[in-house]
UniProtKB/Swiss-Prot annotation:
Source organism per UniProt: Prochlorococcus marinus subsp. pastoris (strain CCMP1986 / NIES-2087 / MED4)
Membrane topology term: Multi-pass membrane protein
Role summary: Converts heme B (protoheme IX) to heme O by substitution of the vinyl group on carbon 2 of heme B porphyrin ring with a hydroxyethyl farnesyl side group.
Enzyme Commission designation: 2.5.1.141
Family affiliation: Belongs to the UbiA prenyltransferase family. Protoheme IX farnesyltransferase subfamily.
Membrane-crossing residue ranges in chain numbering: 63-83, 109-129, 132-152, 160-180, 188-208, 245-265, 286-306
Name this polypeptide is given: Protoheme IX farnesyltransferase
Main EC class the enzyme belongs to: transferase
Catalytic reaction(s) noted: heme b + (2E,6E)-farnesyl diphosphate + H2O = Fe(II)-heme o + diphosphate
GO CC field: plasma membrane
Length: 332
């Protein structure tokens, strides 16, 4: 009995370190429902989509309108998600103190806020960017709320595999904001995020599998167990690494430096996945993989931005000249 209690306390401690309780990290109620922790990474991948185009860097007004519209749409999606899952959140100890279940905000207040953010996002993107960027942003919002939250999440263990399309749309928004169309490079980053999402999310789901099981949400670890889930994480992790390497062909220039800087990111990702494979129920290892996966995607987007600097272009030219010189020397 004592051993079980200690294990439960340990699991709770790990969860609190990864997904802090709202009691420990206080946010204003109106900000909490917008899920602001999710927005920075969405904006980072939007910037990544922009950096893959010939038009990078964008003018300041267009950049601000794109990121501002994306942030507003993401806030609206988060609020609508909270509205739909309000009854579910009441039943989980981890989420029962959120703004809606606890009564800090009313349903009507949050709904009006979500509608206002959606309209503001659409107006900002249409007036300051273009119709395609606005349409893709609203598609991302709808896919998160309708496809993932309402349709897939309560019905299938593959909810995040297909529902991950919502988180993969920002690169398309970034590319379309820059050029007026998406292009193959934008689709590459879209594909990378799609492959990265299951490995990222399932690492978190291992930590929260008991919470999901208690309310009947069929997350993969809750239904199939940690060992099965980690095998799936490994497959998606390797697919992510392979797709990330293809980024060298997606970049207009600076691909050589990108490829070199990418190596430690991929190495660390695979290392953490292998550690979790050796102990699928080790929550500390799941926590480590989850946290690194966030840094990994931020890192990829940063590498894309660095690769478009003059320093990277000069490095690529010098590398090519060195290669040609060595080739000529050995041929001689």
């Amino acid at each position: 009995m004592k051993s079980n209690l200690e294990n439960l306390n340990f699991q709770t401690s790990i969860r609190e370190q990864v997904v802090p309780s709202r009691k420990k990290v206080k946010l204003p109620a109106w900000l909490e429902v917008a899920k602001p922790r999710l927005i920075p990474l969405l904006l980072a991948t939007t910037l990544g989509g922009m950096a893959l185009t010939e038009e990078w860097p964008l003018s300041s007004p267009k950049l601000i309108c794109t990121l501002g519209g994306g942030a507003l749409a993401a806030a609206a999606a988060g609020a609508l998600n909270c509205l739909w899952e309000m009854d579910l959140d009441k039943r989980m100890k981890r989420t029962s103190d959120r703004a809606l279940p606890s009564g800090k905000l009313s349903f009507n207040t949050v709904f009006l806020g979500a509608v206002s953010c959606t309209l503001a996002a659409a107006m900002l993107l249409i007036s300051g960017v273009n119709y395609l960027a606005a349409g893709l942003t609203l598609l991302g919002l709808c896919s998160y709320v309708i496809l993932y939250t309402i349709i897939l999440k309560p019905r299938t263990t593959q909810n995040i595999v297909f529902g991950g399309v919502a988180g993969a749309i920002p690169p398309l928004v970034g590319a379309s904001a820059a050029t007026g169309h998406v292009g193959l490079s934008g689709w590459w980053l879209f594909s990378l995020v799609m492959l990265w999402t299951p490995a990222h999310f399932w690492a978190l789901a291992i930590l929260l599998k008991d919470d999901y099981a208690s309310v009947g949400i069929p997350m993969l670890p809750s239904v199939k167990g940690s060992e099965f889930t980690v095998k799936a994480i490994s497959r998606y992790g390797w697919a992510t690494v392979f797709m990330s390497i293809l980024g060298v062909f997606a970049l207009p220039e600076g691909g050589i430096l990108y490829l070199i800087m990418l190596l430690p990111f991929n190495g660390r990702l695979l290392q953490l996945i292998n550690r979790l494979k050796s102990s699928p129920d080790d929550l500390e290892k799941a926590k480590g993989l989850f946290r690194w996966s966030i840094l990994y995607m931020f890192g990829i987007c940063l590498l894309l931005l660095i690769s478009r600097t003059q320093l990277s272009v000069d490095f690529e030219h010098q590398s090519m000249q060195m290669f040609l010189s060595l080739k000529a020397y050995f041929n001689y």
